[in-house]
Amino acid sequence: DPNDPSVIWLGTGENVGGRHVAYGDGVFKSENGGRSWKNMGLRKSEHISKIIVHPDNSDVVWVASQGPLWSSGGERGLYKTTDGGKNWKKVLGGGEWTGVTDILIDPRNPDRLYAATWQRHRTVAALMGGGPESGLHRSEDGGETWTKLKSGLPGSNKGKIGIAISPQKPDVLYAAIELERTKGAVYKSIDRGSSWKKMSNTVSGATGPHYYQELYASPHKFDRLYLMNVRILTSEDGGKTFVQLRERDKHSDNHSIAFRENDPNYLLVGTDAGIYESFDLAETWKYHKNLPITQFYKVAVNNAYPFYHIFGGTQDNGSAGGPSRTDERQGIRNAHWYKILGADGHQTATDPVYNDIVYGEFQQGVLHRVDLKTGEAVLIQPQPREGEKYERWNWDSPILVSPHKPERLFFASQRVWKSENRGDSWEPISGDLTRDEERLDLPIMGRRHGWDNSWDVKAMSNYNTITSISE
């Protein structure tokens, strides 16, 4: 709250379209600097993208909700309260698949708002990353009415849009727009969004623009932009050209950035690994290791004595293990945890006899057997025989150590595999147990779509796979 720093508004749920996205429980408010919190509603929003508090009236708050990813409906759109969160009114958005992914406020006029809508839907089979309801909008009356901004912008289906306003010249706006087939462009307006000019074909990449696309304008230099991406892209000329920001000794997958008003060399960046801080405009970075924010997919335990160890695969931070307890006076510390694999870690499994044997995997079933004594990690992923079709591995492929025979493993692609020697060799014990359907023939956004629509193929998980096994 710009009027009271002890008041904090918090939106829950990640604003991305990923298969591993975490959903939220609405909007929370703290009136004591974060010591305690109260849920203020919008529990069906699932993914809050941004919150803005009125600079002169703390009772007025705007909340941008992207809404559920896996289903229609929910509380999606732009919501406004005039009584500090007791009641909410939806002021923008109407489609059952369309939410608001970004909002801005004019620093000179709090009644002037800008909003970006995003139409998207993910199923187990596919991701439709855009649609005709994605776009840019402007309000001159605090969000009560809106005008869609079109002049100079592409008329095709659009995906995720990031918007920024120049602190030096607030009539100047910037927009990073995802277009079809994960292409995109950066646009600039010098007249409050009434007309736009294409500056470049720059768009976030890697797993897809749905995972990034946040755009920021520097408060210290006009036309300096930061576009969130695997590696941050920065422009000094309003989006005409972009270069990669220096990110030595820093994690990738960037999602947010903050600045200090009186320090042009300061950057604070949020990534898939946590928070990084720079005091010299990205020449060097400081990593804050003490935040308990690691996201685990699955966990497993071994039978180590006197304290068993816990192992788990994490989102974009590998697979790790650590003790359940310790007899050290300081208790369990970061240093007690150790990494056993990189990439996205997923399911882990342990050997009930040999506590130094752990199984872990990367995304798409890249299974390893790890010896904790030697540190050796051996790739043991089953492979198809000559002449067989390729294996379809789930993003989070299931691994099972038999409770009856510890050297026996089960692993699954579209078929079930069995090993009798801890993964040194494998035999398939089933055929294809899936329907082997064509994913793009299945309904999404409530109906079937043509092949030329806004499919985000790169961001889709392998389909027609087995997701769990038991014995």
Residue spans for each PLM region:
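Beta-propeller blade termini and top-face loops
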Residues: 1-471
